[in-house]
């Protein structure tokens, strides 16, 4: 295998990578994408939008992502299209989502990471295996060393400091830009979603 990202052969490199890489949590939403970096908090909260310039021979170029793409909405020339690659909390356009994620991760880490980041991404509770694989593949293609998925209600409960390990249930209502999820958590897992 190549690189310092996916599979280290030497324990020393694994240990070193923990100190050099960024641990990132991503809420990849229909309306906005938030990125949390360990030790820094939320470093990015931008619209899940991409400005794409059409080129000759079906070649396109990403002109802007996030806030910069939103600023172009309604003002861009005809050859630049503003798109939202996420629909109802899941990936609608894999290639554009991958490129958007890569650019937002680079922006959030200020392009300084020596080792690819370890990433946790929130996914809708009702997402299919195919949709989850698309998110995983997109994050790896964007340069992540490792990717873990967590259901949005579970992430919300952890963020709110709820006692998710207790036998008593905790109810979460996650109202997003494209979906609303309700989850009941008990004994460290989702009892209902």
Map each language-model feature to its residues.
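Nucleotide/phosphate-binding catalytic cleft detector across ATP-hydrolyzing
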Residues: 2-177, 183-193
């Amino acid at each position: 295998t190549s690189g310092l990202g996916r599979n280290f052969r030497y324990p020393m490199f694994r240990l070193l990578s923990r100190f050099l890489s960024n641990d990132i949590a991503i809420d990849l939403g229909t309306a906005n994408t938030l990125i949390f970096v360990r030790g820094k908090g939320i470093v990015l909260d931008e619209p899940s939008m991409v400005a794409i310039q059409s080129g000759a021979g079906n070649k396109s170029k990403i002109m802007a992502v996030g806030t910069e793409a939103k600023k172009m909405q309604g003002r861009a020339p005809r050859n630049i299209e503003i798109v939202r690659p996420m629909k109802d909390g899941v990936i609608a356009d894999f290639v554009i989502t991958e490129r958007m994620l890569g650019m937002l991760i680079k922006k959030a880490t200020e392009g300084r990471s020596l080792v690819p980041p370890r990433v946790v991404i929130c996914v809708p509770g009702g997402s299919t295996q195919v949709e989850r694989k698309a998110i995983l593949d997109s994050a790896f293609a964007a340069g992540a060393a490792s990717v873990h998925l967590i259901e949005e209600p579970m992430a919300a409960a952890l963020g709110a400091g709820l006692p998710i390990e207790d036998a008593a249930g905790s109810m979460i209502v996650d109202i997003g830009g494209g979906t609303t999820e309700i989850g009941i958590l008990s004994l460290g897992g989702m009892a209902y979603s």
